[in-house]
Amino acid sequence: AIDALYAPIHQEGLFGREIFWEQGAACDVVWGRTRGYSDLATFRYTGDESPLRTTYNNFTQVTSRANWVIAKLLEKQAGTALTAVETRSLGEAYFMRAFSHFYIAYRYGTDKQGVPFTRYEDYPDGYDNSIPKQQASVVDNYKYIIEDLDNAIKYLPKFEEYGAEDRGRAHKAAAVAYKAKVYAYWATWDKTQWNNVISMVNELETTYGRDLAPNFDDVFSSDFANFWTKEYLFGIAGTGGDTPGGSEFPGVILENKGWGIYNGWGQNKPSYDIYEEMIKDGAGNDRIKRTLLEYGQEFEFFGETRKFFSTADVESGFMINKYMDAFKYKDADKKGYVSTNGDWPTSRVNMPLIRFAEMLLFRAEAYLATNHPDKAATDLNRLRTRAHLTPIAGNATWTDLYHERRCELAFEFTDHLYDLKRWFHAGNAEIKALAEKELNAHPRARHYADRGDYNSTFEIGAYEDYVNEANPLVKAVKYDDHFIAFPYPSTEITKSGGALKQNDGY
């Protein structure tokens, strides 16, 4: 039952691919291949786009499973002491209920109305299969999530207490990290929550010894020795070979058909916009080289040194490089680094869902929001120093925060789009202007005269797939605040029989 809580987050329907399509509405990533739901990238969505339906259903499924486990274990606990495994399992269930609830809450909830949620343990005679109540505000959802994370901390072990076979399970520090993220998003509606963000990140350092890995590359390494650094908080550990596991995302973003060597899918490519932002730190810096490939950049692929070019699908001129380390080995699939099944192209990488670098970014943001720009600079400079970048001189600004968060976490499942949405809603005027500019921009690409020649000349122009935005005859949608929440799938509205109210503006 516990393993069933984790299984969906590994699959294509969540962090394998589907939840990442949402990022097309920001300017860091373009889809690379034409999809049937381009409205998801142009703020014309209805809630019925298949990625939105799929992720909504999968997260609610995890919540339901966790609810069942919690109710059963609490019922047993009322009559007898739980075993050590049952105690840990109760903590895992609380964590995964909070986890899945959170990803629904912030993406669909606002201060005007929350998202549906119920706790099975609140029914004395057992859950009656009634429709979960829609909370009055997303703040009510956040309160439930924090309570579940506190219970998770009560029952879970520390990460260091796990044996090798159990690493990857929820642990105390992971729950504290998600508390920090919940409080940061809660601060969209209540700025006093920034103080809680600072407290949580401090606790991660002082109580749990979390820190940055020595090198930026270590976070995305194919070496098992680097999977569990102090930076690790929670993620999806993957491997390859004949018994692959983890997220298929590394193969999803690989060049379509992998230059005839491996079955990459060619989806989700970097835009020129994120390259332009990252290159502000200097050409060839450690962070940009690990994060993306540009034309002519050398990289190792199945034991061969190549120079990047791309002839497949819709042109962007770049490819995500963060998760490519496992592909560098000769016979990488046969040696267990990447999956031998190109239809499930996992690889040996511990793909982060939340890591300590993000905690420093949240604390820096909290310091800016509470008028401590000097302390914000200290946290941001820890990231910059690790990547061998020039430190910020003097106090940090909101522009510094925007740049560091965008560049450090590029192409991770940290939800850059929601960063823009929350900054537009509640941000300082400086960062709101940056968010508004990106939300209303059309992503750009490099268009090469000869796509098969890495020395070819190029022009910078609009990405050519999101047809409504590229077509001058169709007026672009101007971002406004109601887009902070997605619309519920129409099937959910219908099934609720009136118990679920659609979000404003849809």
Predicted regions mapped to residue ranges:
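An aromatic- and glycine-enriched ligand-binding surface/loop that stacks and positions planar moieties
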Residues: 1-37, 113-117, 142, 149-153, ...
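Conserved, well-structured interaction surfaces
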Residues: 3, 7-8, 35-108, 132-143, ...
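Long, intrinsically disordered, low-complexity segments
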Residues: 6, 59-62, 126, 144, ...
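Short coil/turn linking the two alpha-helices of tandem helical-hairpin repeats
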Residues: 105-112, 160, 185-191, 371
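Flexible, polar/acidic helix-loop-strand segments at domain edges
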Residues: 280-355
